[in-house]
From Swiss-Prot:
GO terms for biological process: immune system process. Residues 228-239, 340-349 have a biased composition (Polar residues). Interacts with BRD7, IRF2BP1 and IRF2BP2. Interacts with CREBBP in growing cells; the interaction acetylates IRF2 and regulates IRF2-dependent H4 promoter activity. There is a cross-link at K137, K166, K293 (Glycyl lysine isopeptide (Lys-Gly) (interchain with G-Cter in SUMO)). Gene3D superfamilies: Winged helix-like DNA-binding domain superfamily/Winged helix DNA-binding domain. It is found in: Nucleus. The modification N6-acetyllysine is found at K75, K78. SMART domains: IRF. Specifically binds to the upstream regulatory region of type I IFN and IFN-inducible MHC class I genes (the interferon consensus sequence (ICS)) and represses those genes. Also acts as an activator for several genes including H4 and IL7. Constitutively binds to the ISRE promoter to activate IL7. Involved in cell cycle regulation through binding the site II (HiNF-M) promoter region of H4 and activating transcription during cell growth. Antagonizes IRF1 transcriptional activation. This is Interferon regulatory factor 2. There is a cross-link at K137, K260 (Glycyl lysine isopeptide (Lys-Gly) (interchain with G-Cter in SUMO2)). Residues 5-113 bind DNA.
Length: 349
């Protein structure tokens, strides 16, 4: 709990009336004007008992200094006393009568009556504050009420219809229709659109026709592939016809190989189109075809394969200068044979 003590103004009046402090006196007791000795501690002839007893008494009164225990500190006493005097609202300094320099420096103060006391700084009457707060609070409330129904400039007649508003929800737009229960038939129905529809952006994709020439420097345009014929056949014609079945069946033929007869279907198969390639090629490009060639020497299916050692693979021909030598040798042998034949004919004759 804080120590109860006398306030500064009555305590100061008591110190002045005691006449125990030299230099502290009334200049005009009726107007409550008094002076306080204010000599600087650095001045020659300054004395604690003569120039600082008032400041020491205030430090003792406030509990900042205890005689015999604390070390004397006149500068701190004077600073605390000056701060306390400046904080009082009912005491002001008479600066035109004060002398702050010299050995006889002093300050003159005046105690103000209740009628002249100014109001505390930073505080305003409660009435003004309350009016401001009410004014600020009412503005947003009124604005929200005006905009809640969608239209702010409606006549008082429409205010009655606030309870009769019915909401109809469409598939795309929410529309509020005001009823006609309390108005005459002359007033037309009003529709207030609360949620307008969103604006959609339409994007068109165009493709170039096949007839237009396309340069190699340009990028390929967006092309839509035609429907696959294979897919159409799967969806439309699920059951093949007799002709298609006949075309798809292999034709077996009898063949002889090394005195053995066997059936072979080689060479009878027709060419087929890849069913799924129709979706990847356009009309101006040839379709990709797959053909099956007939083997030159087919083998029967029931015969065994010859050993790999008997198979002689032709050696790869490398273009070297020595490749022309066999041709020269064969030519020389032919010439030699012809010469031998001619000689034999000559001898026989």
């Amino acid at each position: 709990m804080p120590v109860e003590r006398m306030r500064m103004r009555p305590w100061l009046e008591e110190q002045i009336n005691s006449n125990t402090i030299p230099g502290l006196k009334w200049l005009n007791k009726e107007k409550k004007i008094f002076q306080i000795p204010w000599m600087h501690a650095a001045r020659h002839g300054w004395d604690v008992e003569k120039d600082a007893p008032l400041f020491r008494n205030w430090a003792i009164h406030t509990g900042k200094h205890q005689p015999g225990i604390d070390k004397p500190d006149p500068k701190t006493w004077k600073a605390n006393f000056r701060c306390a005097m400046n904080s009082l609202p009912d005491i002001e300094e008479v600066k035109d009568r004060s002398i702050k320099k010299g050995n006889n420096a002093f300050r003159v103060y005046r105690m103000l009556p209740l009628s002249e006391r100014p109001s505390k700084k930073g505080k305003k009457p409660k009435t003004e504050k309350e009016e401001r707060v009410k004014h600020i609070k009412q503005e947003p409330v009124e604005s929200s009420l005006g905009l809640s129904n969608g239209v702010s400039d409606l006549s008082p007649e429409y205010a009655v219809l606030a309870s009769t508003i019915k909401t109809e929800v469409d598939s795309t737009v929410n529309i509020i229709v005001v009823g006609q229960s309390h108005l005459d038939s002359n007033i037309e129905d009003q529709e207030i659109v609360t949620n307008p529809p969103d604006i959609c952006q339409v994007v068109e994709v165009t493709t170039e026709s096949d007839d237009q020439p396309v340069s190699m420097s340009e990028l390929y345009p967006l092309q839509i592939s035609p429907v696959s014929s294979y897919a159409e056949s799967e969806t439309t014609d699920s059951v093949p016809s007799d002709e298609e079945g006949a075309e798809g069946r292999p034709h077996w033929r009898k063949r002889n190989f090394e005195g053995k007869q066997f059936l072979s279907n080689m060479g009878t198969r027709s060419t087929y189109l890849l069913p799924s390639m129709a979706t990847f090629v356009t009309s101006n490009k040839p379709d990709l075809q797959v053909t099956i060639k007939e083997e030159s020497c087919p083998m029967p299916y029931n015969s065994s394969w010859p050993p790999f050692t008997d198979l002689s693979l032709p050696a790869p021909v490398t273009p070297t200068p020595s490749s022309s030598r066999p041709d020269r040798e064969t030519r020389a042998s032919v010439i030699k044979k012809t010469s031998d034949i001619t000689q034999s004919r000559v001898k026989s004759c």
